[in-house]
Amino acid sequence: MESPIRFENVDINQILKTLPHRFPFLLIDRVINIREDYSGIGVKNVSFNEPCFQGHFPDRPVFPGVLMIEGMAQTAGVIGIMSVTGTEKPRAVYFLTIDKCKFRKPVLPGDTIEYHMKSIGRRKAMWWFHGDAKVNGVVVAEADVGAMLTD
C-alpha cells in the first residue's frame, strides 16, 4: 500500500524558495506526489535550448547523465526539506555520495524526465535516496544519492 501524499504538486516558484540552485543549474521544473514515506517524483522537461547541448553534442544532442544525477539529488533535496519543514524553507543541500549509478538509455531534447526518488535511510541531517530516472515509463538512469541538509 502506498503512503499518503503530503504535497501533491510543488511548482517552480516553491522550488525556488526551497533550493539555492538557479539557472543554468536548476535541473527540475516541479516535484509531484511527495509522500509521507519520503518519496516523490521530480519532473524535468528537456528542451533543445538547454545550455549543455551547445557542447554535448552539437550534431547529436544527448542530455548528460551527470545532469540527470544532479536532477535526482535536487528532487531528493526538495522531498527532504519539505518533509521535515512542512513547507518550502530555504536550506543548503550538500550532495555527498553517488552509488550504484547506471545510465541505461540516452535522453534527447523533447523528452520529459521523471525522477522517482525514495528515501532509503536518514541519520540526523544526512539523507540517502534511491532514484530511477524515467522517460515514458522506461528507466534511463538509476543511482543511490546521499546528501546533507543544513540551515
From Swiss-Prot:
Active site as annotated: 56
Disulfide bonds: none
Superkingdom of origin organism: Bacteria
The keyword Cytoplasm appears for this protein: yes
Top EC class of this enzyme: lyase
CDD domains reported for this sequence: FabZ
Listed GO CC annotations: cytoplasm; membrane
This enzyme's EC code(s): 4.2.1.59
Sorted UniProt keywords: Cytoplasm, Lipid A biosynthesis, Lipid biosynthesis, Lipid metabolism, Lyase
One GO MF term attached to the UniProt entry: (3R)-hydroxyacyl-[acyl-carrier-protein] dehydratase activity
Main subcellular location: cytoplasm
HAMAP family recorded: FabZ
Family statement: Belongs to the thioester dehydratase family. FabZ subfamily.
Function: Involved in unsaturated fatty acids biosynthesis. Catalyzes the dehydration of short chain beta-hydroxyacyl-ACPs and long chain saturated and unsaturated beta-hydroxyacyl-ACPs.
Identification of the protein by name: 3-hydroxyacyl-[acyl-carrier-protein] dehydratase FabZ
Gene: fabZ
